[in-house]
UniProtKB/Swiss-Prot annotation:
Probably a ribosomal protein or a ribosome-associated protein. This is Probable small ribosomal subunit protein cS23. The keyword Repeat does not apply. It comes from Trichormus variabilis (strain ATCC 29413 / PCC 7937) (Anabaena variabilis). Part of the 30S ribosomal subunit. GO terms for biological process: translation.
Length: 99
């Protein structure tokens, strides 16, 4: 997954997911943010990644699996926990937000 970074916007009522591509020493946005539970963020992210045919199946599956883990954590306990705890639980994911 080192070619891509899963980005999470951690909010009180929603969690949002986006993917950046690593380019050189920086990153470039690859997708917009998809919000959960406002919309089906996982399904929207899946469709967006599938539309980019140059992303390997392995990279796509790794990104979607990590997105599943983050969404499940947020649903089960994370929404009531500070973002710093989520950052510790998922160190390979980039977090930002207000919670």
């Amino acid at each position: 997954m080192s070619k891509f970074i899963l980005k999470i916007l951690w909010l009180d009522e929603n969690v949002a997911l986006a993917v950046d591509q690593v380019v050189g020493k920086g990153t470039s946005p690859l997708t917009k943010y998809f919000f959960w539970p406002r919309n089906d963020a996982w399904e929207e992210l899946k469709k967006e990644l599938e539309s980019k045919h140059w992303i390997s199946d392995l990279d796509r599956v790794e990104l979607l699996n990590k997105a599943t883990e983050v969404i499940n954590y947020w649903q089960e306990e994370g929404r009531n926990r500070p973002m710093a705890e989520a950052q510790l639980k998922f160190p390979e994911v980039t977090f930002t937000g207000s919670a």
